[in-house]
């Protein structure tokens, strides 16, 4: 975990593409909105390791969003109830439930359906905000703190080096 955090620290200051960091933050929010009791959460988490993104930011954001998201559980439950009760989607749900092993994803649960819908709706705005934040950090804040003593000490700490 510490190595992942230092990887994040290096990525913020390196010449990496801001999209890698933004995708990590947006995917962490989408994962945090899903309950961890579903097979869908574990499948999406496993997919994260095959996508080009910053894993340090993914893990850090997942922990941070994990503290905030439980306060939205009633809203996610009602959103999932709304999504599952749509008459147009009833044939789709019936077809999905008949496919073997799809029932293990428990998409019929209101919390999981609400988290899936909310994660899909929040992905693009979170991506745009994170990308703008990384660009603003690199443009305005990094040149000001680049020569600070604390920045030099953290950058040259033994844990930061490989």
From Swiss-Prot:
The chain crosses the membrane at residues 28-50, 57-76, 108-130. Keywords: Cell membrane, Membrane, Transmembrane, Transmembrane helix. InterPro entries: CHP03546 (IPR019935). It is a multi-pass membrane protein. One of its GO terms (cellular component) is plasma membrane. Signal peptide: none annotated. Disulfide bonds: none annotated. It is found in: Cell membrane. NCBIfam families: TIGR03546 family protein. This is Uncharacterized protein TP_0480. It comes from Treponema pallidum (strain Nichols).
